Amino acid sequence: LTAAISVLSAMGVQACPLPTAVLSAQTGYEDYHCVSLTEEMEQFRRSWEKMEARFDGIYTGFAADEEQIGHMIHIAETFHKKKAFLLVDPIMGDHGYKFDIFSIEFCRKMRELAKMADIVTPNLTELCILTDTDYRMIENMTDEKHLLTVIRQLAENLRKDGPRTVVVTGIQFCDNEDGIQKMGNLAVTGKRHILQHSRM
C-alpha cells in the first residue's frame, strides 16, 4: 500500500487509502505479524457514502481473509456503480503455490471480486487459481510461443467471467530469438494482446 500510494501520488493522483491489515513483513517470510483491520472496513465505506464521495478509480490489493473480500465487494458495489474504474490485484500466491494464510473459500471470494473488475492483474499462479487450472501444466513449458498462447487463452477464459482486461504479470520465459531469459507482462483485451518484457 505504501509503495502504491507513492507511485500514485507521483502521477498526480490523490489516494484515499483503506488499509486492510498492518503487517510486520510481507507474507513470503516464514514469520510475520498481521493485525487485521476487518472491523474498520465497513466504517470507512459508510463514512465515504455519507460524504457522498465519488472516486475515479478503486484499486484493491492485499486482503487478510475472505470476510475482507466481502467488504471489498460491498465497497465496489457502492462506488463502482458511480462510474469508478475498478482494478483488482488478486493477491493469493506465487511460484505455483497458494499462500498458506488463504483458504479455498478465500480464493472463491477472490474470483467473485475479480469478475467485477475492469482490469485484473494476476501473476501466473493467481491466473491458474482464478481459472481453476493446474499450474503444473504450465511450469515446465519451455517453448515461448506455446507458453504465451496458453497464458493468453487462460486470460481469455477469465475475461469471459467479467473483467474487460487481464494483465498477467511476472511471466518468465526464454526468448526463442536470442535465447535470453526474460520477464514480462501480458495484457489481454478482447482480440488484442500486448507483451512487454525485459531481461531478467
Question: Where would I find each of the regions flagged by the language model?
Answer:
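Short pre-catalytic strand/loop immediately N-terminal to key active-site residues, enriched for Gly-Thr
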Residues: 193-200
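Conserved N-terminal subdomain of the carbohydrate kinase-like
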Residues: 1-100
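Conserved phosphate/ATP/ADP-binding segment of small-molecule kinases
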Residues: 101-193
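Residue-identity detector for glutamine
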Residues: 11-14, 26, 43, 68, ...
